[in-house]
């Protein structure tokens, strides 16, 4: 399978038309494009397109291949950029960092500031996501580093622990009965409609940290990142498990954070692939991070 074929496929998927892709994007004849896509379908052994007079759409297999094709082209772009800039004496290039929502991202920001002071032509690309999103992109080579909230399996990675802990609790409306308490217990959660992140719902370790199987509670919704979940809470749709300090709960905010008792906290780690071949910008970031943490 050639990269050209993947580019052709993505153009057809984007334009939803063989003729538009051929004439407006790829500048090849339509028969040439059709032949290339037919050969791709034969190579993969699946039908990728549903062709009609109005437009061309993707089959279920086509949608799955589109996701992989986009990942391949993104990785190719990273690689081309990395090697084009590697020969320059001054460190120029990109660092790709992913992480969950946590106040500890300030360590990443401080390391980037330190790195930028020395290497101002390094660009940083930040991706927000839960541990599954981040480790998947890390494994695919689309990220250089990931900031993960524990408990998390980090056996596949090199890592440094951050000197910080995040506190777990509930995000509730200020007029919610639990808002009047200084702390909440697991017993307080009985019959309370709850929102939990998809990551925590899938992790036995989190149930162990909480001291209760989340599936035994009244979880009415799951979320990926906390902001949209906070809108549900603001509308009175329950209380959300979350970490302290991710949202502004002061002033005119309708929301407040109530920590658990006994206190439940999570450590934080920055991870990267074992035995990596770092680009110069990625190596510069790791050096800056370790300096920020007093490790170098």
Can you name each region flagged by the protein language model?
Residues 179, 192-213, 278-287, 296:
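Secondary-structure junction motif
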Residues 155-161, 165-167, 227-275:
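Beta-alpha-beta core module
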Residues 30-31, 88-119, 123-128, 132-136, ...:
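N-terminal winged-helix
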Residues 107, 256-296:
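A late-sequence structural motif
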Residues 157-168, 172-194:
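Flexible hinge/capping segments at coil-to-helix
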Residues 41-60, 77:
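A short LG(V/I)-centered, amphipathic sequence patch enriched
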Residues 110-114, 131-172, 208, 234-237, ...:
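Short beta-strand-centered segments that line the small-molecule binding cleft or hinge
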Residues 10-27:
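Short helix-boundary/capping micro-motifs
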């Amino acid at each position: 399978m050639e990269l050209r074929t993947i580019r052709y496929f993505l153009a057809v998927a984007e334009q939803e038309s063989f003729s538009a892709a051929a004439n407006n994007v790829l500048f090849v004849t339509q028969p040439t494009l059709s032949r290339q896509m037919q050969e791709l379908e034969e190579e993969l052994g699946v039908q990728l397109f549903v062709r009609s007079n109005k437009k061309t759409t993707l089959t279920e297999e086509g949608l799955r291949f589109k996701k992989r094709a986009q990942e391949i082209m993104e990785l190719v772009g990273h690689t081309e950029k990395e090697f084009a800039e590697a020969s320059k004496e001054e460190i120029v290039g990109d660092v790709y960092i992913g992480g969950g929502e946590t106040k500890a991202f300030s360590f990443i920001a401080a390391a980037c500031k330190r790195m930028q002071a020395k290497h101002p032509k390094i660009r940083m690309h930040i991706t927000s996501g839960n541990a599954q999103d981040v480790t998947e992109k890390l494994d695919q080579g689309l990220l250089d580093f990931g900031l993960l909230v524990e408990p998390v399996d980090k056996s596949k990675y090199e890592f440094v622990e951050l000197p910080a802990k995040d506190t777990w609790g509930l995000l509730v409306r200020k007029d919610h009965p639990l808002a009047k308490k200084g702390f909440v217990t697991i017993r307080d959660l009985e019959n309370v409609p709850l929102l939990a992140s998809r990551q925590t719902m899938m992790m036995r370790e989190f149930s162990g940290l909480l001291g209760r199987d989340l599936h035994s509670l009244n979880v009415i919704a799951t979320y990926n990142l906390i902001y949209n979940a906070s809108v549900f809470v603001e509308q009175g749709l329950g209380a959300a498990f979350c970490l302290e300090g991710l949202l502004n709960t002061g002033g005119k905010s309708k929301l407040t954070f109530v920590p658990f008792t006994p206190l439940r906290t999570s450590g934080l780690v920055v991870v990267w692939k074992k035995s990596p071949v770092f680009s110069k910008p990625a190596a510069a970031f790791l050096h800056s991070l370790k300096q920020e943490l007093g490790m170098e």
